[in-house]
A protein has these predicted regions:
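C-terminal-most transmembrane helix of multi-pass membrane proteins
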Residues: 53, 154-208
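Helix-loop interface residues and adjacent transmembrane-helix termini in multi-pass membrane transporters
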Residues: 4, 30-32, 86-87, 143, ...
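Residues that define the loop-to-transmembrane-helix transition and helix capping
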Residues: 8, 34, 90-91, 147, ...
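C-terminal transmembrane-helix exit sites in multi-pass transporters
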Residues: 17-39, 158-178
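Hydrophobic transmembrane alpha-helices of multi-pass small-molecule transport proteins
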Residues: 23-24, 33-53, 70-74, 97-104, ...
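Transmembrane alpha-helical segments that form core, pore/gating elements
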Residues: 21-23, 55-111, 122, 204-208
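Hydrophobic core positions of alpha-helical segments in small-molecule transporters
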Residues: 13-14, 36-39, 62, 69, ...
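Hydrophobic alpha-helical transmembrane segments of multi-pass membrane transport proteins
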Residues: 2-4, 23-24, 50, 66-80, ...
């Protein structure tokens, strides 16, 4: 999708995953989206649209379609992992990444040899950026709803300009700042509301 449309379009449409989970989560998981969930989804998508406003384009229908399919696949993966909340989702993640490796093997064989720095970067990406983050994701999905596991990571692309600013002093646009603030605020308020709701439902220390 990133080769057939803009990066902004691809990222925004991939994060349509919360919509698919809100629609299908009730059927497959029994987790029905609440009014607060839909409000959060609308705020997040609105904020991300504003965040990427400078780069969004209406063309590139094929690339945009592939990005939507990517979001649907992300939602499907999350629902499948949440379905295993009482067992161990890690095995499914390992098998999925092994399958991805097998599919990508023909391109690896024909690629130029990696330098030492390339192998170091590949190792870090495999163990930290993917391995450790997937391990955390598998643990988190046991304790939160499928919708929450895709809403909270939305802050990841929003924080990218912050790291760029710290590393290169490149300032994000006003649209990016405004959109990012909306997304972070919506996700934070949703998380606080969820914590309070679960705290109110939890039995007290003297409950029998």
């Amino acid at each position: 999708a990133t080769k057939l449309t803009t990066a902004a379009n691809a990222i925004l449409l991939q994060y349509s995953a919360p919509i698919w989970i809100a629609l299908f989560g009730a059927w497959f998981l029994g987790e029905r989206a609440t009014r607060a969930d839909w409000f959060t989804i609308a705020a997040v998508l609105g904020g991300m649209t504003l965040f990427f406003a400078d780069s969004l384009e209406l063309a590139h229908a094929l690339g945009n379609s592939l990005a939507v399919i990517s979001g649907l696949c992300f939602a499907g993966m999350t629902i499948a992992l949440r379905k295993q909340k009482d067992s161990s989702p890690v095995e499914s993640i390992i098998l999925g990444n092994l399958l991805a490796f097998i599919i990508g093997l023909p391109w690896i064989i024909g690629a130029p040899a990696l330098s030492t720095s390339g192998w170091i970067a590949l190792t870090l990406l495999g163990t930290v950026q993917l391995g450790f983050s997937y391990w955390l994701y598998a643990r988190a999905i046991k304790h939160v709803t499928a919708l929450e596991t895709v809403l909270i990571p939305v802050i990841e692309p929003i924080l990218n300009p912050v790291w760029v600013l710290l590393a290169t002093s490149e300032h994000p646009s006003r649209f990016a700042l405004g959109g990012g603030a909306i997304v972070i605020t919506a996700v934070t308020l949703r998380a606080i509301a969820t914590i309070r709701t679960r705290g109110a439902r939890a039995p007290g220390p003297h409950a029998t």
